[in-house]
From Swiss-Prot:
Keywords: Chromosome, Developmental protein, Metal-binding, Nucleus, Repeat, Transcription, Transcription regulation, Zinc, Zinc-finger. Homodimer. Interacts with msl-2; promoting recruitment of the male-specific lethal (MSL) histone acetyltransferase complex to chromatin. Interacts with Nelf-A. Interacts with NELF-B. PROSITE patterns: ZINC_FINGER_C2H2_1, ZINC_FINGER_C2H2_2. A zinc finger (C2H2-type) spans 127-149, 360-382, 388-410, 416-438, 444-466, 472-494, 500-522. InterPro entries: Znf_C2H2_sf, Znf_C2H2_type. This is Transcription factor Clamp. It comes from Drosophila melanogaster. Pfam families: zf-C2H2. Disruption phenotype: Lethality; females die at the third instar larval stage, while almost all males die at earlier developmental stages.
Length: 561
């Protein structure tokens, strides 16, 4: 049996037919077994689905090996050949979810084979820290939170896991995905939970299914231990204990989960190696394949070509026969090496989101876009690519429009004017943010404490109150801060710099908030004129104070300033 177990293939259980295990040998011979349960398998086999309708084979996942029991998730379509289990994508309506586990002896077990998918929206998508189990609405926020775990120890994390209790479940990660997607036109989505690792690329994700539990304010949402809440504490409530906030990041072996194939041609999928060399080659393939443009016309559906399904004007393409991973392609792609027929072969699929006007979703931060070209341009912000450089100061930008806006700093141009107060701004977003100071609008709301903010950047900084993240560290004393501005102000304590001066008494301060508090002293006494020194050395503020009899100038003397 060990010599034959190269792949384990699940056939689609359409019309109530039971799933069947298949062993694929090195020469391509497929041996079938009537049952899955109890079969011996390799340490890291690859699971497949084949559909009875067209014979297409799909690579769904490899088993993870994070604990004694290995687990993978299988999206089972009903009445069709489209299926996927990826970030933010709906499963086919009426689909069932099968969970296959492998015990320490390598025996396959099936549980919840026909568990129905809950009808939920994309709002159920969340990102879970694999160290402390905290939940976050965006992957970028999770990655920022996980920096706080880098100095911990694995033993401490194991203690917290023991306190948390509950059923442990292995994680299947998605490597090499450019844009996880499902081509189902209409469908319902389950509560899919994303688990990320710093060792993965931003586009790589882990997918697991888990029921979400309500957190209690008086207990740590991670380990369940009681927390002492300060009754007079202002701001958001603390949701995690100090021990969990200092837990370390643990290494977790990640396996592969790819977008399900969509096609009417049988195409066996090969096992993809997880060695560094193989993964580097896969990343090169992904980078090379995603540099094209959106196709504008359909290819012929003749011999040697994939069928084309035109959904709308905003499309992407996906090759079933290149590298066996189902990686999404953009633009035209030659398949002469596959079919022996030259030319372009395109298979179009559409990313579906909950917003019909913005069907393209960023799988890193959750941003929505109306065009794929906008999404592609947006992802440069995450990759760090900056091809547009200022010829004056040398700063580089990810988009041409960012460079254009930056150039106004040098030219002094401020074309955007507030209709209420007349203030002018160099960029349109700055004007919109300013206008909210007049309207009182606060459209950016924190999902934890429901506090609203006028600017998205302010909300982003506010979230660190809940995550406990303090990524900005003083190199002199080691103090850490949640915001760069706080570190900048703190650095003035060491340098002695006090750039903020009072225009009334010339007192200097390190930050503008201290200056603002100081000005309140002058406002309390009605002081508006610059100070002077009297003959006896006391500080004198000259001010015109109206009197009932006359309006002569009077001197207000304040000692000690």
């Amino acid at each position: 049996m060990e010599d034959l177990t190269k792949n384990i293939i699940f056939t689609n259980a359409i019309n109530g037919q039971p799933a069947t295990i298949q062993y694929q040998t090195a020469d391509g011979t497929i041996l079938k077994q009537p049952k899955i349960e109890g079969q011996k398998t390799e340490q890291q086999p690859t699971f497949y689905y084949t559909t009875n309708g067209n014979g297409g084979t799909v690579n769904l996942a490899q088993l993870a090996t994070t604990d004694d029991n290995k687990t993978c998730y299988i999206a089972q379509p009903v009445g069709g050949y489209n299926y996927a289990l990826v970030n933010g994508m709906p499963l086919n309506q009426g689909a069932a979810l099968g969970i296959a586990t492998v015990d320490a002896q390598g025996r396959i077990q099936i549980v919840n084979q026909n568990k129905p998918i809950a009808a939920n929206t994309i709002s159920n998508i969340s990102f879970k820290c694999d160290v402390c189990s905290d939940m976050f609405p965006h992957l970028a926020l999770l990655n920022a939170h996980k920096r706080m775990h880098t100095d911990g120890e694995q033993q401490q994390q194991q203690q917290h896991n023991a306190q948390a209790g509950g059923d442990s479940i292995a994680v299947v990660s998605a490597q090499g995905l450019v844009q996880a997607q499902n081509i189902i036109g209409n469908g319902q989505m389950g509560q899919i939970q994303i688990v990320s690792s710093d060792t993965l690329e931003p586009v790589q994700q882990s997918v697991m299914q888990q029921q979400q539990h309500e957190s209690k304010a008086s207990k740590c949402i991670n380990c369940g231990s009681s927390m002492l809440q300060q009754s007079k504490r202002k701001g958001p409530k603390q949701v995690r204990c100090e021990s969990c906030m200092q837990a370390e990041q643990t290494a977790q072996q990640q396996q592969q989960l790819f977008v399900a194939q969509d096609g009417q041609m049988a195409h066996p999928v090969q096992i993809i190696s997880t060695t560094p060399q193989a993964q580097a080659q896969l990343q090169q393939i992904v980078a090379a394949q995603t540099g094209g443009t959106t196709p504008k016309r359909e290819a012929s559906s003749g011999s040697g070509h994939h069928p084309v399904k035109k959904r709308n004007s905003q499309q992407m393409t996906k090759c079933q026969k290149c590298n066996g991973s189902g990686v999404v392609l953009v633009g035209q792609h030659s398949h002469a090496s596959h079919s022996g027929v030259g030319g372009s072969v395109k298979q179009s699929v559409t990313v579906k989101t909950e917003n019909p006007s913005k069907p393209f979703s960023c799988n890193i931060c959750g941003g929505l876009f109306s065009r794929y070209s906008s999404l592609w341009s947006h992802k440069k912000l995450h990759s760090g690519e900056k091809n547009y450089k200022c010829s004056i100061c040398g700063l580089a930008f990810a988009k041409a429009v960012y460079l254009k806006n930056h150039a106004r700093i040098h030219t002094g141009e401020k074309p955007y004017k507030c209709q209420t107060c007349g203030m002018q701004f160099s960029q349109s977003p700055h004007l919109k943010n300013h206008e909210r100071t007049h309207s009182g609008e606060r459209p950016y709301v924190c999902g934890v404490c429901d506090k609203g903010f006028a600017r998205h950047a302010t909300l982003w900084n506010h979230r660190r109150i809940h995550t406990g993240e303090k990524p900005y560290k003083c190199e002199i004393c080691g103090s850490a801060f949640s915001q760069a501005a706080h570190l900048k102000n703190h650095a003035k304590v060491h340098s002695g710099e006090k750039p903020y001066k009072c225009e009334i008494c010339s007192a200097a301060f390190a930050d503008r908030f201290a200056l603002k508090r100081h000005r309140g002293i002058h406002q309390k006494y009605g002081q508006t004129a610059p100070r002077q020194t009297s003959s006896d050395g006391m500080i004198v503020h000259k001010q015109e104070i109206p009197d009932m009899e006359d309006e002569a100038q009077q001197e207000v003397i304040i000692g000690g300033l």
